[in-house]
Amino acid sequence: VLMGSNTTHVVNHTTIPVLIVPSDCRWQPINVIGWACDYKDVVKTTPAIAIGDFVEATEAKMVVMHNNPDPKAFDPELFHNNVMVAEMFKRIKPEFDMVSYEDFLEATHNFVEKHKVDMLLVIPKKTSWFESLFKRSHTKMLAFHSHIPLLCLRSLS
């Protein structure tokens, strides 16, 4: 089991899925898989077949979370990508939860508690070195602060 900066290095530099299991995590069946989705380029980046197969193999329910810090600002692309995710995963019939928090970790923690999520799924996106100076990686934050297993799948592009 890896945790911390070594873990995030592995996640960022490998092409295979990485399962991060916190040291204080106790084994339990996977009944609910939560996906923290940013709804950016979902059709091009989401490994939908792998996710669908995994969810079916575990016989779990999938709940998709999107955190929109400003719910008053209507974004047609956000709505479109929500519809696309529903279409991509129609065989597993995911539930959707649009949350609104300034803090991503708080949003994720409350989502996990509300839906009793057993495993969190993330798809880390490649960012430029310059972008990484100004934007904190959500995957990195979760790797350091999650209390449930975190499955990191490589983005398709």
Segments predicted by a language model, with ranges:
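Glycine/small-residue-rich hydrophobic helix-like segments
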Residues: 73-127
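Conserved short-loop catalytic and cofactor-binding motifs
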Residues: 35-39, 96, 127-130
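Short beta-strands and strand-loop turn motifs
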Residues: 63-67, 121-124
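Amphipathic coiled-coil/heptad-repeat helices and related helical stalk/stem segments
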Residues: 3, 47, 81, 104-105, ...
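General small-molecule cofactor/ligand-binding pocket signal
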Residues: 19, 63-65, 95-100, 151
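Gly/Ser-rich helix-loop-strand patches that form or flank binding pockets
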Residues: 1-26, 114-115, 119-157
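Short acidic/Ser/Thr-enriched loop-to-helix initiation segments
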Residues: 9-14, 24-65, 71-90, 144-145, ...
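A conditional alpha-helix N-cap/helix-loop micro-motif detector
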Residues: 44, 101-102, 132
